[in-house]
Structures are given as structure tokens and as C-alpha cells.
UniProtKB/Swiss-Prot annotation:
Pfam families: Amidase. Keywords: Hydrolase. One of its GO terms (cellular component) is peptidoglycan-based cell wall. This is Putative amidase AmiC.
Amino acid sequence: MSRVHAFVDDALGDLDAVALADAIRSGRVGRADVVEAAIARAEAVNPALNALAYAAFDVARDAAAMGTGQEAFFSGVPTFIKDNVDVAGQPSMHGTDAWEPYAAVADSEITRVVLGTGLVSLGKTQLSEFGFSAVAEHPRLGPVRNPWNTDYTAGASSSGSGALVAAGVVPIAHANDGGGSIRIPAACNGLVGLKPSRGRLPLEPEYRRLPVGIVANGVLTRTVRDTAAFYREAERLWRNHQLPPVGDVTSPVKQRLRIAVVTRSVLREASPEVRQLTLKLAGLLEELGHRVEHVDHPPAPASFVDDFVLYWGFLALAQVRSGRRTFGRTFDPTRLDELTLGLARHTGRNLHRLPLAIMRLRMLRRRSVRFFGTYDVLLTPTVAEATPQVGYLAPTDYQTVLDRLSSWVVFTPVQNVTGVPAISLPLAQSADGMPVGMMLSADTGREALLLELAYELEEARPWARIHAPNIAE
């Protein structure tokens, strides 16, 4: 076992993004000093974590020196961008090495929003290939390891972002989520991870055109207030007027809520350990005065996993078939990993079933509306078992890895399909000392409610930090 973190007495200290932004504004620390400290931290821990996809340290130094975005709230606070969105002048490799790198010509829209809040990007972070797996363990690029214990996975697909935030390199990093890719790394690395409502933040054109819009951009942080502040600031730059505003969420929820607790997915009951930890949190919510009801039925029909895997495979098939057009002539599908190719083969053999699967996935929104007509919030584990060790979810056999992944991450994709917000909070620890995430979901547009409830839980049960790992009981 090896715990890896970069928390030292430098310009970053152990400040979260809000506190660091205030220190920069007040002149207590300098922008250049903060960026240099983050670079030093990245260089110290990345050899053990393998979290960086591309280092843009000189670009960050230049941005700090020029004072870019000085009027923005997070001005000078360092961050990273996940390597599946474009940053001008930097390659976008999507967690693979299946083509020769080339520089993007312009920032993506979400990159402009992230940087528009004043955050200074130090580079790009690793992910699983095209974000299809819940672990980043590419056969040639190597695994992204968990800073709490490098024998364990950092989760995925926002693996590098999760590892670097948890290790203290930066307080906040870009992430996105098409089946759990914000929430799973949050659960594995002891972080706050909010997947927002469908359409809350801008998306790349290819994601906007999907028949079921499952992808959402967001961030990973160590504190609830950092996540809340990011959405407040992002909303000032880009607003979807079809959704109620998140607004400025700064305090715990006042009203007592109707909360449903579910520990059984469409495939299985959560492991005994994770189930017990979930029920313990349900007890805390009752102590806080919320009305908690234990619900036996899972939040999706029995057909959900098969339908979602078929749709996931449709996305893999699109990457395989359009790779040369999308990524250039050097694209070589034989270099793709076994999960990507296996998913593509699966859907290629079952294309006749895809239209009905898409229809059923779309209809799941009706079920969600009915559910949240009865309850304000749904509590489930983020994943069905505690974080696995590196290698468990990356065997070469496609069917084995698919079965293990489906069983582990079965709770998270439902919110992607229905488009509702969900937040993973690091409210528990496993017997081996690894963070365990608990997931709270609400109806579309109710991110503010989830953040308020998260504030209440953060106050009632402060979570472990990697350099102060004992959870307050």
C-alpha cells in the first residue's frame, strides 16, 4: 500500500478553490506562486498516479503572468481539463493512443466556460478509452492509480481529474459524465462529484446530437462550496433558460425532505458492506429530521442494463466506424482496447434491437417523473461495491470485464438516461480505509436542493481527507 498526496506548506496549502481565490484576490498569495506550487505538486505525485495526459505548465505560467481573467471569481486558481474536450494548442487523445496526436485549433465551449470562471489550466487529465470504462487501465498507457492507496483504481472515466484533486495538486478539475464518470471517481477518491441536469452546461456538438443525451460536463472538488461556487460562476457565463437557475447556494437545506433509500439495483443488492454504510447514512438523515422511506424496487426496469449496454456499444461502434474521419488518417482501430472493440461488436451484431432499446431508455424519464413526484431525493450507493484494486476491472476478456463493470457501476447510468442531477459525496469509508461514495439524486433542475442537502451532510458528518483520513462520527 502507498498513500500519495501533495499537501505541503506552500502557496496552495490545503485550501479549497473558494479560499484560494480569496487569498489571491486579497494579495496574501500571488497567482504565479500558486501556479508554481501546483506544478511542483503535479510533478511530485504524477509518477505514482499516472493521472496526467498532457502537461501545459508553460501555458499556465504565461496565463498567471499575464493575469488572464483577473476579474473572474476563481482568478488564478489552478485546474486541469479532462482529455476528451478540446483546448486550443493541445492534443485531445480521449484516453487512447489509436492515432497520432495533433493540436486542437480552438477551445471547446465547455473549456471556454471553465477558463472563463478564472481557473488556470495546467494541462489535461487521463481517462478511460473514450470514457467507456469505469476504470482507466489502458494496456499501453497504464492504469491511473488512486492516491488513497495506489494498489487501487481511481475510477473513471474522469480518472486523472479525480486523482489529482484528491492528492491535493489542484482543488478543482473539469470532469464529465456519460454513465457515472464524475460520480464514480468522486466515490473512489473521496470527492464531491455533481452530475448536473441534462443541458445545464454546454456540450460538444457530437454529444448534443445523441438520440439519448446522456453526457454532462461538470467538476470534481473536495468541498461542497467549491462545487456550488463553480456552478454559480459558470451560470453567469452560459445559461440554459429551459432549466431553473442553480443560483448562489451557500447554506444547508432548511426544509425537511422526503427521501427514498434504495440499495438494490436492477442487477443486484449492494455488497453487505456498502449496503450497511448506506443504511447508516439513511439513519443520519432520519436523525436530521428528514422523512426516510426504504424502497425495495430499483429505480429502473429489468431491461435497463441490456438496453444501456446496447446504447453504449452504439457509441463505441460510431467511434470505430468514423475514427478516420474524426481523428485523422492515422486512426488505427486495431489499437483500441478490448472493451471498446467488444462493445462495438456487440451492437454491430444487434443493430436490429437498437431502436427499441433507445425507445425504452427515453421512456425511463416518465418513470423518473413519477418517482420524484413522490420523493424529493433518492439515496443510493454510488457504486455497488467498495473500490477495487487495479486489474480487477481490466482483464483482456471482453465479457468478463463487461460483467464486472455492469455489476459495480449499475446505480449511476440511470441518472444519465433520465437527465436528472445526482451528486456523490464521500460520506463513508470501507474496512480497508478507502472512500465510499453515497449518491443523492433529485428531479431535473434541482441541483440547488442537492447542494443544500450536501452542505447539511458535510456539516453533520465531515468527510475524511487524504492527509487527515479519520472521519468524524
